[in-house]
A protein has these predicted regions:
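HhH-family (HhH-GPD) DNA N-glycosylase catalytic core used in base-excision repair
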Residues: 1-159
Length: 159
């Protein structure tokens, strides 16, 4: 029994050593594989990630990406439809829309905007984004303002 445990320990040590040696190459290969698979126009055009990809300004990408991710539950065609509607409401200019406060009249009421997300909830998100973009200028700066905790924890503290 003890001999079997020693064999297992040697095997685990060997595998761990091999993983460390190959880690850099395997991570690179992993990232390249998925970049090739997902970072191409064929995939992007049929995925909700297409919305932030439409923009060039960092703030527009952040806002579009955040809101699209927030709505990304359910069937992909329905997500695309909701994200498309949201993009149209923002007149394809997320930062200007957030700063304009037009969302106060566009997103009020308890009726659903998408599935279980009410217009009021969308209004809360826009209110939160407005605070970030008026105080920090971009979400990245807001997250970097406090270095404590993970990015998700910092994002939650901003809420």
């Amino acid at each position: 029994m003890k001999e079997n445990n020693k064999e297992q320990e040697r095997f685990v040590a060997y595998i761990t050593k091999q993983q460390c040696v190959n880690e850099a190459a395997s991570v690179t290969d992993f990232l390249r594989k998925y970049a090739f698979r997902y970072h191409n126009s064929a995939f992007i055009s049929s995925d909700p990630v297409q919305f932030p990809h439409r923009y060039h300004r960092k703030e527009d990408i952040e806002i579009s990406g955040f809101l699209t991710a927030y709505l990304s539950f359910g069937a992909r065609p329905q997500i695309l439809k909701a994200a498309g509607r949201l993009d149209a409401v923002m007149q394809h200019n997320p930062l200007v829309y957030v700063l304009s406060k037009d969302w106060k009249s566009d997103f009020c009421g308890e009726e659903s905007f998408y599935r279980t997300v009410s217009k009021n909830k969308m209004g809360e998100l826009f209110h939160w984004l407005h605070g970030i973009y008026t105080k920090y200028g971009c979400m990245e700066a807001a997250l970097m303002a406090c270095q404590e905790g993970s990015p998700i924890q910092r994002l939650c503290r901003l809420w």
